[in-house]
A protein has these predicted regions:
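Aromatic-anchored segments of alpha-helical transmembrane domains
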Residues: 31-36, 111-120, 169-184
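Hydrophobic alpha-helical transmembrane segments of integral membrane proteins
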Residues: 100-130, 192-197
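Membrane-interface micro-motifs in multi-pass membrane enzymes
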Residues: 133-154, 188
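N-terminal signal-anchor transmembrane alpha helix
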Residues: 3-50
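Actinobacteria-biased recognition of intrinsically disordered, low-complexity terminal regions
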Residues: 1-23, 202-227
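Loop-to-transmembrane alpha-helix initiation sites
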Residues: 181-196
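Hydrophobic, membrane-inserted alpha-helices
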Residues: 66, 84-92, 147-153, 168-178
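N-terminal TM1-TM2 helical hairpin plus the immediately adjacent luminal interfacial "cap"
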Residues: 38-100
């Protein structure tokens, strides 16, 4: 006889994971790399963090691999629990709503664009003698750019007036640091958030609005436009 009560929670968890496969595969990889960093010696840990960074040095040597690999590591392994919660609250909901490929496209573009733009600002600051040349080797890894983009997209999932309260909170969270000595990471977060907000056309609601506009234009009194 199969247990009913014990299998129900497991089934719900499995269904939740399957409904957002990209989020949970990504989270699994981050969990593994966090364990590697936590178990490594200090020297090996520093080497791995710098080698997998998308800083100026690594972008010049390994542009494609550094952009990809940097999104699978976090600098502080104990923060994995916080990131896991954020992945479930933000990424999983957005992936389930958009579909895996549109979600992946959005966060991928945001991660790459924010990384390249922020590192370009670092390079300009180094050339202008506002930052030391050692910043070419700065540790630049993490998942926060993707989270910022997904957080922007999540706004369109909420109905008014909650959407506007959420937007004000998110914009304040990522925008306030820009007013008080912003770092290159703060600027990257703002860029990623902006790209997430700009991805409205990828949402199901945008497609529904376009279909509704097409239906209205085809009704009597609203002939379709000439081409």
């Amino acid at each position: 006889m199969k247990p009913v009560l014990s299998s129900a929670p497991a089934g719900r968890v499995a269904a939740w994971v399957r409904s957002a496969p990209g989020t949970h595969i990504w989270l699994l990889v981050i969990g593994i790399t966090s364990l590697v960093i936590a178990g490594a010696t200090e020297g090996l840990g520093d080497f791995l963090l710098h080698r997998t960074s998308s800083n100026i040095h690594e972008l010049n040597r390994h542009p494609l691999s550094s952009l990809l690999i940097s999104g699978f590591w976090i600098e502080n392994p104990p923060s994995f629990v916080l990131y896991a919660a954020l992945f479930e609250l933000v990424h999983a909901h957005v992936e389930r709503w958009l579909g895996t490929w549109r979600w992946l496209l959005t966060i991928g573009v945001a991660h790459v664009t924010a990384t390249l733009a922020s590192q370009e600002l670092v390079l300009l600051a180094i050339e202008g003698h506002r930052l030391p040349r050692s910043m070419t080797h700065v540790v630049d890894i993490g998942v926060s750019y993707g989270l910022a983009a997904a957080a922007g997209l999540l706004a369109y999932r909420l109905p008014p007036p909650w959407r506007y309260l959420y937007l004000a909170s998110v914009i304040g969270f990522f925008g306030i640091p820009l007013l008080s000595g912003a770092t290159f990471t703060d600027i990257g977060h703002a860029i990623a958030l902006t790209l997430g907000l700009a991805a409205w056309p990828l949402t199901p609601d945008a497609g529904a609005d376009a279909a509704a506009d097409g239906d209205r234009s085809a009704t009597p009194g609203h002939p379709p436009p000439d081409h």
